[in-house]
Amino acid sequence: MRGILSIQSHVAYGHAGNSSAVFPMQRMGFEVWPIHTVQFSNHTQYQEGWTGRAFSADDISELVRGLNNIGALEKCQAVLTGYQGSAEQCLAVEETVTKVKQANPDALYVCDPVMGAPDKGCIVAPGIAENLLNRLMPMADVIVPNQFELSQFAEMEIHTLDDAIIACQRALAKGPKVVLVKHLYCLSDESFNMLLATQEGTYLAKRPHFEFAKAPVGAGDLISAIFTAGLLKGWTPKQAFQHCHDACYGVLNATYQAGEWELQTIAAQQEFVEPSKHFPLEEVTLKTVE
């Protein structure tokens, strides 16, 4: 039985981390093997707080060892990683990706390098950002950063579309074959912007921006998951990006229309198979400097 190994956070209530990523990949036709870095009652934006615990790096390694014992790693089509709770967990992920690629050289590694955002800065524990930037992102086949995380990896500030394109080129030169910027903040506030960069070209995706009373948590995890599943279907990065962008819009639209804070992942599940709206991609290039 082939499948996707997804190593990220988990919430019992709502959709964030694995709770946002696992079902969409299953709905797109893939077996998913989730390993949780933390397990919380709910996401951490609730005023009432949350309960739960973080798992150790050894907990992750132990589960991977068990999967290896039954021959599962050679059937692993991709490793998808998101939020990591400690620097040691990052090292366990590095070891896991190495083991999976030894067992199946065709396996993809998709890294969502959760670090922070421009308005919040770096929000992760000490050592995590360094391990993401120096270990996990360079070894990934695909990275799915936001604008802040891309700027950290490319070691440059991003204020314009040209800056973003240059940053993506710098990122591609460090190892990854595909860069999907899941939120490009520096462009118009009137639209939500995402960017895809490969050696073949760079594409901008724009969709209407929703004015949520409280922004849903877990949309980035959803983007990474749908894109991973699209690539494993044999689609080109451009095709997977188009599908991912349209499907994510559909889920967010359903969430907005329902007046909900938590993503309406189950109610809008048809979006993962057949998105209801289509927003054509725009190929973009660096403006010629006179």
Curated annotation (Swiss-Prot):
<keyword id="KW-0547">Nucleotide-binding</keyword>
<keyword id="KW-0808">Transferase</keyword>
<dbReference type="InterPro" id="IPR013749">
    <property type="entry name" value="PM/HMP-P_kinase-1"/>
</dbReference>
<comment type="subunit">
    <text>Homodimer.</text>
</comment>
<keyword id="KW-0418">Kinase</keyword>
<dbReference type="GO" id="GO:0005524">
    <property type="term" value="F:ATP binding"/>
</dbReference>
<dbReference type="GO" id="GO:0005829">
    <property type="term" value="C:cytosol"/>
</dbReference>
<dbReference type="GO" id="GO:0009443">
    <property type="term" value="P:pyridoxal 5'-phosphate salvage"/>
</dbReference>
<dbReference type="GO" id="GO:0000287">
    <property type="term" value="F:magnesium ion binding"/>
</dbReference>
<dbReference type="GO" id="GO:0008478">
    <property type="term" value="F:pyridoxal kinase activity"/>
</dbReference>
<feature type="binding site">
    <location>
        <position position="9"/>
    </location>
    <ligand>
        <name>substrate</name>
    </ligand>
</feature>
<feature type="binding site">
    <location>
        <position position="221"/>
    </location>
    <ligand>
        <name>substrate</name>
    </ligand>
</feature>
<feature type="binding site">
    <location>
        <position position="182"/>
    </location>
    <ligand>
        <name>ATP</name>
    </ligand>
</feature>
<protein>
    <recommendedName>
        <fullName>Pyridoxal kinase PdxY</fullName>
        <ecNumber>2.7.1.35</ecNumber>
    </recommendedName>
</protein>
<comment type="similarity">
    <text>Belongs to the pyridoxine kinase family. PdxY subfamily.</text>
</comment>
<keyword id="KW-0460">Magnesium</keyword>
<comment type="pathway">
    <text>Cofactor metabolism; pyridoxal 5'-phosphate salvage; pyridoxal 5'-phosphate from pyridoxal: step 1/1.</text>
</comment>
<feature type="binding site">
    <location>
        <position position="112"/>
    </location>
    <ligand>
        <name>ATP</name>
    </ligand>
</feature>
<keyword id="KW-0067">ATP-binding</keyword>
<dbReference type="InterPro" id="IPR004625">
    <property type="entry name" value="PyrdxlKinase"/>
</dbReference>
<feature type="binding site">
    <location>
        <position position="149"/>
    </location>
    <ligand>
        <name>ATP</name>
    </ligand>
</feature>
<feature type="binding site">
    <location>
        <position position="144"/>
    </location>
    <ligand>
        <name>ATP</name>
    </ligand>
</feature>
<dbReference type="Pfam" id="PF08543">
    <property type="entry name" value="Phos_pyr_kin"/>
</dbReference>
<dbReference type="InterPro" id="IPR023685">
    <property type="entry name" value="Pyridoxal_kinase_PdxY"/>
</dbReference>
<dbReference type="InterPro" id="IPR029056">
    <property type="entry name" value="Ribokinase-like"/>
</dbReference>
<comment type="function">
    <text>Pyridoxal kinase involved in the salvage pathway of pyridoxal 5'-phosphate (PLP). Catalyzes the phosphorylation of pyridoxal to PLP.</text>
</comment>
<feature type="binding site">
    <location>
        <begin position="44"/>
        <end position="45"/>
    </location>
    <ligand>
        <name>substrate</name>
    </ligand>
</feature>
